[in-house]
């Protein structure tokens, strides 16, 4: 009798354990890089012209006070940042990292090799916290990302 009771309880645990449930589909965030900017992150995207990253450093410095950014808000979990290089004539990349001390404690993803006209996926398992995302090769400003909820 004890054996049957133990087997029944074990069966319930196996059936009801959350890990046995199908994993949620990842969230896909589509982003478009144009010279000196990530379009979806800007309140009022502008069409800058740049043939190299040095020009973007100058453009970003000169326009810093005029530009406002949208806060990207996501829930924790597997996230795919699908990034497209639109009309930037040099290879780009993408970088998500924690802000401040979060840079040490939160997950990060980065990569390069994003040529003009190409799209690349950057996959990360986001945890709650405050992040920044940008392209250091374009370069773009650091855009805010807040991950909260369940």
Where are the regions a protein language model picked out?
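Extracellular/periplasmic metallocenter environments
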Residues: 24-31, 35-53, 63-66, 89, ...
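N-terminal post-signal-peptidase region of extra-cytosolic proteins
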Residues: 59-71, 76, 81, 107, ...
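Contiguous segments within soluble domain cores/interaction surfaces
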Residues: 72-105
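Bacterial N-terminal signal peptides
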Residues: 7-17
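Sec/Tat signal peptide C-region and signal peptidase I cleavage site
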Residues: 19-23
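Positively charged n-region of N-terminal signal peptides that target proteins for export
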Residues: 1-5
């Amino acid at each position: 009798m004890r054996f049957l009771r133990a087997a029944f309880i074990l069966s319930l645990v196996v059936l009801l354990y959350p890990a046995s449930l199908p994993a949620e589909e990842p969230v896909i965030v589509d982003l478009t890089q144009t010279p000196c900017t990530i379009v979806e992150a800007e309140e009022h995207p502008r069409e800058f012209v740049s043939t190299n990253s040095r020009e973007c450093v100058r453009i970003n410095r000169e326009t810093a006070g005029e530009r406002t950014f949208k806060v990207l808000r996501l829930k924790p979990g597997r996230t795919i940042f699908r990034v497209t290089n639109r009309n930037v004539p040099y290879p780009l990349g993408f970088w998500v990292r924690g802000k401040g001390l979060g840079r040490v404690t939160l997950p990060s993803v980065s990569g390069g090799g994003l040529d003009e006209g190409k799209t690349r996926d950057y996959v990360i398992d986001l945890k709650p916290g405050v992040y920044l995302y940008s392209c250091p090769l374009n370069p773009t400003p650091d855009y805010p990302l807040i991950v909260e909820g369940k």
